[in-house]
Curated annotation (Swiss-Prot):
PROSITE patterns: RIBOSOMAL_L29. This is Large ribosomal subunit protein uL29. Pfam families: Ribosomal_L29 (PF00831). It comes from Methanosarcina acetivorans (strain ATCC 35395 / DSM 2834 / JCM 12185 / C2A). HAMAP family: Ribosomal_uL29. GO terms for cellular component: ribonucleoprotein complex; ribosome. Keywords: Ribonucleoprotein, Ribosomal protein. GO terms for biological process: translation. GO terms for molecular function: structural constituent of ribosome. The gene is rpl29. The keyword Ribosomal protein applies.
Length: 67
């Protein structure tokens, strides 16, 4: 899953943003589970990227009063 830019997030519909947020949260849980199980992540910076993208989506949702 690609990391989204702010401009890409703003052009999404409300439903697309909600779906993307759910997908990213699920991916974050999987990455954290892999790490906590002792596995080495394929991309160590991926967890931070996912967290930042989630924050971007939530910020834009708040700005647009979608929450």
């Amino acid at each position: 899953m690609a990391i989204l830019r702010t401009s890409e997030i703003r052009t999404m519909t409300i439903e697309e943003r909600a779906d993307e947020l759910e997908n990213l949260n699920n991916e974050l849980v999987r990455e954290r589970a892999l790490t906590s199980a002792g596995g080495a992540p394929e991309n160590p910076g991926r967890i931070g990227e996912i967290r930042r993208t989630i924050a971007r989506i939530k910020t834009i949702q708040h700005e647009l009063n979608e929450i």
